[in-house]
Amino acid sequence: SALAINQPNYSVLKELGLNED
């Protein structure tokens, strides 16, 4: 999600595969 991209731990979410475009 766009909100996740704004989070400082976005890279962590990306690692976990939780980031949604």
From Swiss-Prot:
Natural source organism: Ctenopharyngodon idella
EC numbers on record: 1.2.1.31
Entry superkingdom: Eukaryota
Residue pairs linked by disulfide bridges in the UniProt entry: none
Keyword field contains DNA-binding: no
EC category name: oxidoreductase
Keyword Oxidoreductase: yes
Coiled-coil zones: none
Subunit record text: Homotetramer.
Gene: aldh7a1
Keywords from the named record: NAD, Oxidoreductase
Reactions catalysed, as given in the entry: (S)-2-amino-6-oxohexanoate + NADP(+) + H2O = L-2-aminoadipate + NADPH + 2 H(+); (S)-2-amino-6-oxohexanoate + NAD(+) + H2O = L-2-aminoadipate + NADH + 2 H(+)
Protein's UniProt name: Alpha-aminoadipic semialdehyde dehydrogenase
Gene Ontology molecular function, alphabetical: L-aminoadipate-semialdehyde dehydrogenase activity
Membrane-spanning ranges: none
pH dependence: Optimum pH is 9-10.
Homology family: Belongs to the aldehyde dehydrogenase family.
